[in-house]
Every structure is written in structure tokens, then in C-alpha cells.
């Protein structure tokens, strides 16, 4: 049987590759680059050493930025107000590329390294079923065999291979949008994450003593420039990860509700994601009416939940994106942010579509409603609330 394996080069997928070869299967490995800081040539070399008959490295960084990250920014995507969906966003794209190669190779099955306790199994299986239907079988050895990291390492040693990354305290997943850190001391929700868990951000107390100011330009909701310099979104994200992370901003530590019914302690680094979403939300407040703003928050939450829950194929997502895109037509302008020792504050914003009027809001000059106008407005505005309050007070 020919199996196409979504291969990260880590411990689990390396053990799966050896297991599949032990079972007599031909294995074609696929590594999809979505911005992870990994030596992809080394990953390819490892795949061949472990017995892959063919290896594909797919560069999908630009596509990840332009198709997935851009919409996450427009949707202010923060699952449970914290997690910017880095891993969740990348899985549909990786599954798509793996499915394409499975078709190209006329594979009998595709395999992945997801555990039965995680969200990724839902994301991968759902997308693979969408692209491959029932023609190509989905194999999940970690789930099927309840494969622990210790067992995976033993499989590799038994076959004469050194387990990759076994010395690491943490399980890491990273891409252009975020870096996820799990395991080790982080499994204790009361334990502060040790500094060795972080790679993209410095400790805030060790950040520079002078603040960093940045001006981020947006066009129709999408970041297009930093300090006036136009650049592609992938470059903007990469640059902000480096610049903002150096000032200690971008760390996330929270309890997360997984799709599979478990609560997990999750630690992330996402300097660019948090910066761009904060700037985008501020620009939205500058241009939207109050009703648009409230409605947009509903759209954002629904979109974020669908993506987190592995339902990229859900038709509602496309419907939500049409509304999100329509509202983002007006989110054009510049946002100025100040980053200092682990904090970020928006300190300026401008848009040609701004509803803000300096003249109207000035308390010393300009337009003022008359006393009669104000009294009339307050009377009408408060009618419902006053009537209900009085009626209910009668009944205790």
C-alpha cells in the first residue's frame, strides 16, 4: 500500500514513518512550510534515512499569509479572546497540500501524527475527507496505537535510529503566525512558564529601556506597510515577530477549551499576530458605527470558533467572510503603536473614513446641543428603561 504521510520531521511522524515501513508500506513524505523555523533540507534528509521512497517539500508561506492570515486579521481572530489561531489556521492548508500529493501519487492512504486528545485530528481528518472523499483511507497511528512519546522513541531506537528532539522539554509547533509550547512544567497550570520555553520574545524585564514606535498601514483591513514602507504581508508578519518580540510583547498563557472536551493550559508566542489584531481593531473603532462594531464582533467570534473547531469546510465560514470583507472595505488608514517592556498601546490612528470629528468633540469650541435638544433626547432615550424599572419596582 502506498501511504502519503504529513511529515514534520519530529518524533511522532518519524516513528510513524518507521512503523509504516515495518508494515511493508511504501511511504511518500510531505512537509509543508508555513513559516516554521526548521531546516527543511534536514527534514528531507531524515525522511529518506527513515525509509521514505519520495519526499516533497511544499513552500506555502505566501499562500498562508495571503489567504489565511489576512482573513484572521480582518476577523480579529482570537479564540476565547486569547489564541490567534496559529496552528488552527495552518492545518487546512497543510491538509490541502497533502491531499494534492496523495492524488498525484495515486496513494491508497494518507497518514498524520495527531493524537486523540488534540484538536488537530479533527482539523486534518475533516479537511482530508473533504479533499479525498472515501477514495483514500486516513491513517492515524498515534491515535490508533495510543502512541506515547516514549513508545515513539523506542520504535526508532529498535530500528537503529536516534529519536529527534527527545532531549527537548517541550513540544513545539510553530508557523509564521504563532509559536505553541506544550508539555513539561507547563502541564501544571499554576507553574509560571520558564524562560527557556520562549524563543520569539524576550523577558519583558530584559527588554530595551526605550519604547518602540511603529506605524502600521492598512488597506481594506489588510496590513500593507510598516513605517511607510510597503511590503507583502508575510514580510510584515515576519518583521513584527522580530521587532515586537525583542520588546517582550506577544506572550500568551491561558486555559483553553479544546474541541474534544478537555481543558488545556496553552502557552503561545505571537508578537505580530497580537500587534496586528490590536491595531486592526482600533482602526475598526475609528471607522465603524456602533451598530457595525457590535455586529462585527459577532461575525469575528463565529469565524474564530469555526476555524478553531476544525470546520474550515463549513459553508457558514464563506458567508461570514463575505460580510467581514464588506465591512473591511472601510478599514483603511494608519495606526501608531508603542511597544514597551511587554506591553503594547495604540497611541494614534488616522483614516480617510474616520467618524471622529475633533471640532465636534471639542468642549471649548464648536457645536453644542441646546439644553432643549438634550432634554428631549434623554427623555426619548430612557423611556423603555424607566418604564420597565418603575413597573418592576411595583412588584418588588
UniProtKB/Swiss-Prot annotation:
GO CC terms in record: cytoplasm
Positions annotated to bind L-aspartate: 115, 119-120
Annotated metabolic or biological route of this protein: Amino-acid biosynthesis; L-arginine biosynthesis; L-arginine from L-ornithine and carbamoyl phosphate: step 2/3
Any one Pfam family match given in the protein's UniProt record, by short name: Arginosuc_synth
Binding site for L-citrulline: 83, 119, 123, 171, 180, 256, 268
CDD domains: ASS
EC number: 6.3.4.5
One of the protein's GO biological processes: argininosuccinate metabolic process
Keyword RNA-binding: no
GO molecular function: argininosuccinate synthase activity; ATP binding
Entry binding sites for ATP: 6-14, 113
UniProt-listed PROSITE patterns: ARGININOSUCCIN_SYN_1, ARGININOSUCCIN_SYN_2
Record's subunit section: Homotetramer.
Family from the record: Belongs to the argininosuccinate synthase family. Type 1 subfamily.
The name this protein goes by in its record: Argininosuccinate synthase
Protein's organism: Hyperthermus butylicus (strain DSM 5456 / JCM 9403 / PLM1-5)
